[in-house]
C-alpha cells in the first residue's frame, strides 16, 4: 500500500524515540501483565471518575528538526545587548572544554543526586572541589555543595542565624540597605512566615537597633562600594549577633575573606565562575559557615569517609539534617540544589587555577579603574571611591545617557537616583570601555584606553589596602595541574567514568522519574539567544523568552487543569513553599489568617512537612490504612478537629505508595468541606499527563517537577524547576518580584527566587519535549510509564512481594518491593540488594522510602523492554543469590551481597572469599560492565570524622 505524504513526513518520529518499548514490545508486555491494550490497562488502574475523556489539546507532535527551527525563530526575537546591569549577574566566558565535555555531556547531566555514593565518586569529587573553592575564598570552616540561588541563600542564612543565635528572645533581622533588591525581596518573604521583623537601614546604623539576632551585610554593595566591615563585625560579635555576609566569588579572588574578618556565614552566587546568565538561571549559590554551626547548615555537604576496604571515599555527610530524614524538623526543605552548575564553577576554578583567576579578577578591576579614571577626568562624579568591578556614575542628563546606551545596544543599570550603574566582567574588552566612554561622554571625549591604563596600572587606590587579600587561595594540587586543555579534558573524563548515569544504564529510582533527556531538548540551552540575557534587561529585549515561557505556561495550564501558572520557583521544594504561601495569603485575604494546620499523609515526601513548616504551618500527620491509602476516617476526624484552623492538605497523586487511590476526590471534598485548600504534590505527575490532571481531580494548587515529568535532566542533583499551577482564586497570591513586573501577573506577593522566572534558561527543554510529543504522545508516555512499572511488578512479585497495589493488583508508575520478609528470613537487607545491583550495572532503586526496608522502582516510559528485562533478570539473580545464603552455600558474613559492590582493585588482589571472582564482578556477564571505584561506604566513620575539604592527591591514587 502506498504511504501518504503525512506518513512519510513522520511528524511523530520523536515519540518513538522517547518511548523505550516499541509497539511489538508493548504488546508482549501487555500480554505479561494481562491486558489487551494500553487503554484497557489504564482503564483497570485509574479511577474512572478522574479519567479525562480526551487528552488536553497542546498541539500535534512534530519532529526534532521542526521543533528546533520553530524555537530558534522564537529565540531570535531576543535582543543580545551588552549588559552592564550587574546586580549579581554578569556575562561570562565558559571555557569550551567545560562546555563540550561537561555541560553538553549526558554522563554529567543525566546523573542523579549522589545518595548512592559508590556510583557517584566523580561528581562528589567535583563538588568537594566546589566546597574547597568556597572555603578558600570565604575564609570559613565548612561549606555546602550549593544552594538554589544567592537570594535563597540569604534567606537560609537568616534562618540559620536564628537557629544558632544565643539571643533567643531577639526576633529582628537587620539587612544593610545596599544588598541586592532581589535578595531583600526573598528575605522578606521568608521572614514573614517565620515571624521575624526585617529592618533595612544603612550598615552604620545597625547598632542603633535593638533585639537583633542576625545581620546581613554585602561586601560589595549593590551599587559597587567595597566595604571594610571588620570593625563593625567585631562590635556585632561582642553583642552575640550572628553576622552573614553576601559576597562575590570573583571579587573574593582579590578581596579579604569575610570569614577572616569574623563573619559567621558567607554566601553568594557562583555564577561568575563560568555559568551563563541565562535570563536568571540556573546558577549555584555558595554557602559557608563556622565549624561550630555545622549541624545547622542548610543544603547538601560532601564529606570524606572510608570505604569497606579502608580507602578514601566521598559521600553526602550529616544527612540527618536534611528533609528526607528530619521532615518538618529539617534545617531546610532543600532537595534539588544546583549540582551541575556548582560543578561548572568548580571546574572553572580547576581549569584557571589561582593564577588564572587572579589574572581575570585583576583584569576586570583594571578595566573598572580605566573607566573610572577617564570619567573623572571628564568631570563625572563616582558615588563610591572604593570599588571592584562596579561604578555608580552620577550623570546630569540621565535620559540622554540611557538613550545613547540603547542606540549602542548597551544596557546600564538605570534604577539608581540621578546615576547609572556599570558592572564590568571577564568578557569586557578595550573596545567595550571605549564604547562606554562614548555613551557616557559623547563621541568627542578624546580618551584613550591605553593611555589611561598606564596611569592606573601603578597607582590604583580603588580597593582599600585593608581589603586586599594577603593569603594564598586554591593551593591544593587539583587547582594547579589541569590548565592545558588535554589535562582538563582527561580530568573531567576521569571523573565522569567513576559515575553511573543514564548514558550507561537505567536509573530505576522511585519518585524520581529518571526519563530520557533527549539531545534535541538540550541543544537550545546553550544558544546565545537564550544563555546571554540578563534577567533584569528591558522586557522588549526578551520577547523571545516571554513568548516561549507563555507558550510553555499555556501548555502546562492545560495539562494540569489549572487556571494560571507561576514559573518562578526553581526547585520542587521551592514550588511547594510558593504554593503553600499562596494558600496562606489567600486565607489571610479572607480574614482567615488563623488557618495554619497542614494535614500531611504519613507516606508523604520529606519536603512536604519541611515546606509546610517553612510556610509557618503546623503539620498534622494523617494515617494511611493497611493498603497504603489515606485513611478517610482519620482524615475526616483530623479535618474536623482542626476546624477553622485547617489551612490545607498536601497529598501526592498517584500516592507515594505507587497507587491511584480510588478516594482521591473524596479526600479533596473533605478538606474543602472544612474550609481547607488541596495542595497536590506534582512529584508523580508522570502518571497523570494526558490521563487525568490535578485540577480535574479537585486540587487547588500543585507544583510541577519539570526535572522529572518534563525532561529537564537532574544534573547530578540539580538544576530543577518547580513552577506552580493554581486555580483562579489563588492566582493573585503567587510570588511576584520587586525588580521585574511579571507580565499577566496581578500578584503583590514577595519573591521566592532571585530571578522573576527562576531558572529560565532550562525552560526550552520542557518546551521542546511538549512540542515534539504533542497531546497524544504525552498521553502515551504516561501510559507506557505505567505499563513498564506493572511489567516489572508482575515479573518480580513472586520473588519480592509488591507492598501496595490498587484494584486488580495493579500499580501506578512505580512499585514498592518489600524486602523485610527476606531480611527477617535470611539477614540480607535492602541495602545489600541495592549495593549488589551495582555489580550488575544498575543504580539502585529508592531505598527505604516511603517505607523502611523496601525498594521503590520507577522505570519511566523511556526504558526499552530489553533494559527492563536486564533489570528484572538482575533482581531475580540476586534473589537466587539470597537463596544460596539461606541454604548455607555462602555464609551471612561472606557472600556477594554483603560484600558488594566489588572493585577492580579487589579483583586483582589476593582472593579470600567463599565465592569466585567471576561471581563477584561479572554476575551478568562482561558486556557493558560498570566498575565502581570504591567499595561500600562507611557512613558512621564519615559523620564521626567529618572532613569536608579536598584531601591529598595521593588519597585518590
From Swiss-Prot:
EC number(s) per entry: 1.4.4.2
Entry keyword Oxidoreductase: yes
Pfam family, one: GcvP2_C
GO MF: glycine binding; glycine dehydrogenase (decarboxylating) activity; pyridoxal phosphate binding
Protein name: Glycine dehydrogenase (decarboxylating)
Stored HAMAP family: GcvP (MF_00711)
GO CC term, one of those recorded: glycine cleavage complex
Enzyme class: oxidoreductase
NCBIfam families: gcvP, PRK04366.1
GO BP term (any one): glycine decarboxylation via glycine cleavage system
Species lineage: Bacteria, Pseudomonadati, Pseudomonadota, Gammaproteobacteria, Enterobacterales
Catalysed transformations (reactions): N(6)-[(R)-lipoyl]-L-lysyl-[glycine-cleavage complex H protein] + glycine + H(+) = N(6)-[(R)-S(8)-aminomethyldihydrolipoyl]-L-lysyl-[glycine-cleavage complex H protein] + CO2
Organism of provenance: Enterobacter sp. (strain 638)
Cofactor(s) essential for the protein: pyridoxal 5'-phosphate
Task performed by this protein: The glycine cleavage system catalyzes the degradation of glycine. The P protein binds the alpha-amino group of glycine through its pyridoxal phosphate cofactor; CO(2) is released and the remaining methylamine moiety is then transferred to the lipoamide cofactor of the H protein.
Keyword entries, A-Z: Oxidoreductase, Pyridoxal phosphate
Entries under InterPro entries matching the protein: GcvP, GDC-P_C, GDC-P_N, GDC_P, PyrdxlP-dep_Trfase, PyrdxlP-dep_Trfase_major, PyrdxlP-dep_Trfase_small
Subunit structure: The glycine cleavage system is composed of four proteins: P, T, L and H.
Amino acid at each position: 500500500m502506498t504511504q501518504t505524504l503525512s506518513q512519510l513526513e513522520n511528524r511523530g518520529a520523536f515519540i518513538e524515540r522517547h518511548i523505550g518499548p516499541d509497539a511489538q514490545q508493548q504488546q508482549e508486555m501487555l500480554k505479561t501483565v494481562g491486558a489487551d491494550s494500553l487503554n484497557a490497562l489504564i482503564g483497570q488502574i485509574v479511577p474512572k471518575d478522574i479519567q479525562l475523556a480526551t487528552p488536553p489539546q497542546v498541539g500535534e507532535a512534530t519532529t526534532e528538526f521542526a521543533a528546533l527551527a520553530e524555537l530558534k525563530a522564537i529565540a531570535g526575537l531576543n535582543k543580545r545587548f551588552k549588559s552592564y546591569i550587574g546586580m549579581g549577574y554578569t556575562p561570562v566566558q565558559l571555557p569550551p572544554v567545560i562546555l563540550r565535555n561537561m555541560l553538553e555531556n549526558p554522563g554529567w547531566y543525566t546523573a542523579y543526586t549522589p545518595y548512592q555514593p559508590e556510583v557517584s565518586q566523580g561528581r562528589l569529587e567535583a563538588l568537594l572541589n566546589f566546597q574547597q573553592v568556597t572555603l578558600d575564598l570565604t575564609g570559613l570552616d565548612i561549606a555546602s555543595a550549593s544552594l538554589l540561588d544567592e537570594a535563597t541563600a540569604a534567606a537560609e542564612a537568616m534562618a540559620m542565624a536564628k537557629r544558632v543565635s544565643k539571643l533567643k528572645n531577639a526576633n529582628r533581622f537587620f539587612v544593610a540597605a545596599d544588598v541586592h533588591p532581589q535578595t531583600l525581596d526573598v528575605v522578606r518573604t521568608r521572614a514573614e512566615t517565620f515571624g521575624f521583623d526585617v529592618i533595612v537601614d544603612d550598615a552604620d546604623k545597625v547598632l542603633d537597633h535593638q533585639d537583633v539576632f542576625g545581620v546581613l551585610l554585602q561586601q560589595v554593595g549593590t551599587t559597587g562600594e567595597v566595604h571594610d566591615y571588620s570593625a563593625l563585625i567585631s562590635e556585632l560579635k561582642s553583642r552575640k549577633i550572628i553576622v552573614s555576609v553576601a559576597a562575590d566569588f570573583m571579587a573574593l579572588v582579590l578581596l579579604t575573606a569575610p570569614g577572616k574578618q569574623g563573619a559567621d556565614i558567607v554566601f553568594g552566587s557562583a555564577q561568575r565562575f563560568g555559568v551563563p546568565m541565562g535570563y536568571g538561571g540556573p546558577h549555584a549559590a555558595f554557602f559557608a559557615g563556622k565549624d561550630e554551626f555545622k549541624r545547622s547548615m542548610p543544603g547538601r555537604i560532601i564529606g570524606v569517609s572510608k570505604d569497606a576496604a579502608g580507602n578514601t571515599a566521598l559521600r553526602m555527610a550529616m544527612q540527618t539534617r536534611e528533609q528526607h530524614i528530619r521532615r518538618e524538623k529539617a534545617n531546610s526543605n532543600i532537595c534539588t540544589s544546583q549540582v551541575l552548575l556548582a560543578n561548572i564553577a568548580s571546574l572553572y576554578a580547576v581549569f584557571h587555577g589561582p593564577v588564572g583567576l587572579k589574572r581575570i579578577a585583576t583584569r576586570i578591576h583594571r578595566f573598572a579603574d580605566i573607566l573610572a579614571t577617564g570619567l573623572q577626568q571628564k568631570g563625572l562624579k563616582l558615588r563610591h571611591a572604593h570599588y571592584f568591578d562596579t561604578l555608580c556614575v552620577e550623570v546630569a542628563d540621565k535620559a540622554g545617557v540611557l538613550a545613547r546606551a540603547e542606540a549602542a545596544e548597551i544596557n546600564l543599570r538605570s534604577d539608581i537616583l540621578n546615576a547609572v550603574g556599570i558592572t564590568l566582567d571577564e568578557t569586557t574588552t578595550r573596545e567595550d570601555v571605549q564604547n562606554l566612554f562614548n555613551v557616557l561622554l559623547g563621541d568627542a571625549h578624546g580618551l584613550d584606553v591605553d593611555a589611561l591604563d598606564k596611569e592606573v596600572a601603578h597607582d590604583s587606590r580603588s580597593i582599600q589596602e585593608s581589603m586586599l587579600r594577603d593569603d594564598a587561595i586554591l593551593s591544593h594540587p587539583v587547582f594547579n595541574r589541569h590548565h592545558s586543555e588535554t589535562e582538563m579534558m582527561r580530568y573531567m573524563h576521569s571523573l565522569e567514568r567513576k559515575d553511573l548515569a543514564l548514558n550507561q544504564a537505567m536509573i530505576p529510582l522511585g519518585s524520581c522519574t529518571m526519563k530520557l533527556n533527549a539531545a534535541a531538548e538540550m541543544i537550545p540551552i546553550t544558544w546565545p539567544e537564550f544563555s546571554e540575557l540578563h534577567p533584569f534587561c528591558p522586557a522588549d529585549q526578551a520577547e523571545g523568552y516571554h513568548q516561549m515561557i507563555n507558550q510553555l505556561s499555556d501548555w502546562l495550564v492545560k495539562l494540569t487543569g489549572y487556571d494560571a501558572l507561576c514559573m518562578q520557583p526553581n526547585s520542587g521544594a521551592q514550588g511547594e513553599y510558593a504554593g503553600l504561601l499562596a494558600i496562606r495569603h489567600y486565607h489571610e485575604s479572607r480574614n482567615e489568617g488563623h488557618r495554619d494546620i497542614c494535614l500531611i499523609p504519613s507516606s508523604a515526601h520529606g519536603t512536604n512537612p519541611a515546606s509546610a513548616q517553612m510556610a509557618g504551618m503546623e503539620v498534622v500527620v494523617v494515617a494511611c490504612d493497611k493498603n497504603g491509602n489515606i485513611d478517610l476516617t482519620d482524615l475526616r476526624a483530623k479535618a474536623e478537629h482542626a476546624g477553622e484552623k485547617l489551612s490545607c492538605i498536601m497529598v501526592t497523586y498517584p500516592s507515594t505508595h505507587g497507587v491511584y487511590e480510588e478516594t482521591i476526590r473524596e479526600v479533596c471534598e473533605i478538606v474543602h468541606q472544612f474550609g481547607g485548600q488541596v495542595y497536590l504534590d506534582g512529584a508523580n505527575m508522570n502518571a497523570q499527563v494526558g490521563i487525568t490532571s490535578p485540577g480535574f481531580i479537585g486540587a487547588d494548587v500543585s507544583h510541577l517537577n519539570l526535572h522529572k515529568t518534563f525532561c529537564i535532566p537532574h544534573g547530578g542533583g540539580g538544576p530543577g524547576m518547580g513552577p506552580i499551577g493554581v486555580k483562579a482564586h489563588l492566582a493573585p497570591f503567587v510570588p511576584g518580584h520587586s525588580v521585574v513586573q511579571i507580565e499577566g501577573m496581578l500578584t503583590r506577593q514577595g519573591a521566592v527566587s532571585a530571578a522573576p522566572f527562576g531558572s529560565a534558561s532550562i525552560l526550552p527543554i520542557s518546551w521542546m519535549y511538549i512540542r515534539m510529543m504533542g497531546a497524544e504522545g504525552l498521553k502515551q508516555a504516561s501510559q507506557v510509564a505505567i505499563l513498564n512499572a506493572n511489567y516489572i511488578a508482575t515479573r518480580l512479585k513472586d520473588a519480592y512481594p509488591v507492598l501496595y497495589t490498587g484494584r486488580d493488583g495493579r500499580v501506578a508508575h512505580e512499585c514498592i518491593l518489600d524486602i523485610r520478609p527476606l531480611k527477617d528470613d535470611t539477614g540480607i537487607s535492602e541495602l545489600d540488594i541495592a549495593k549488589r545491583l551495582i555489580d550488575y550495572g544498575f543504580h539502585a532503586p529508592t531505598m527505604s522510602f516511603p517505607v523502611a526496608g523496601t525498594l521503590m522502582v520507577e522505570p519511566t516510559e523511556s526504558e526499552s523492554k530489553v533494559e527492563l528485562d536486564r533489570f528484572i533478570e538482575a533482581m531475580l539473580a540476586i534473589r537466587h543469590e539470597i537463596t544460596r545464603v539461606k541454604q548455607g552455600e555462602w555464609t551471612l558474613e561472606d557472600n556477594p551481597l554483603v560484600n558488594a559492590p566489588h572493585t577492580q582493585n579487589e579483583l586483582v588482589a589476593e582472593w579470600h572469599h567463599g565465592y569466585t571472582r567471576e561471581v563477584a564482578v561479572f554476575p551478568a556477564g562482561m558486556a557493558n560492565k560498570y566498575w565502581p571505584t570504591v567499595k561500600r561506604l562507611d557512613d558512621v566513620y564519615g559523620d564521626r570524622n567529618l572532613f569536608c575539604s579536598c584531601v591529598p592527591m595521593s588519597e585518590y591514587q
